[in-house]
Amino acid sequence: MTSVSIHPSVDGGVARGGAEGFQGGTLECHCASDKVTVEVSAQTAHNHACGCSKCWKPDGAKFSVVAVVPRDNVEVTAHQEKLKIVDESATIQRHACTGCGVHLYGRIENKDHAFYGLDFVHTELSKQQGWSAPGFAAFVSSIIETGTPPEQMDEVRARLTELGLPPYDCLSPALMDALSAHVARKKGLLH
């Protein structure tokens, strides 16, 4: 067992599967009062550890843990006025609390994007149990961009594999296939 810390929610092991019939919960920012709350009224999918430099990570974590849910199942229920988009030029518009910096959800506004209609959420911000479990790690090499020395990458990949999170330097094969199929449909090559 390696000593590399990936993320507090997976470092002790990854609980497999989500609770049968689970229908979501409430995400809360980290502010002591006047918390931003977001209701997610569905189970998440494609939960994964993400090493990209844009995703919100708790202090000391090399990766975020993020999943997707249909955007119609995401609703800000308190203190929407505290939310601000982190980077307006990014594909995923990450809505962060201006008080504590936590990203509550990310939304793709480009209707031509393959993942349009899906919002990105960090289920660790919820007290409810039963969310889908992480199943892979994406954008692993990107942690170098946030300060991880390249010589540690073999150990990081070994730890991800040990946790049952296959490491990819892009998305999982199923998600990459979905992106490519979307492009092929737009070109008229698939229907």
From Swiss-Prot:
Zn(2+) 2 binds at C50, C52, C55. Zn(2+) 1 binds at C29, C31, C97, C100. This is Glutathione-dependent formaldehyde-activating enzyme. Pathway: One-carbon metabolism; formaldehyde degradation; formate from formaldehyde (glutathione route): step 1/3. Binds 2 Zn(2+) ions per subunit. Residues 22-169 form the CENP-V/GFA domain. PROSITE patterns: CENP_V_GFA. Keywords: Lyase, Metal-binding, Zinc. Catalyzes the condensation of formaldehyde and glutathione to S-hydroxymethylglutathione. GO terms for molecular function: S-(hydroxymethyl)glutathione synthase activity; zinc ion binding.
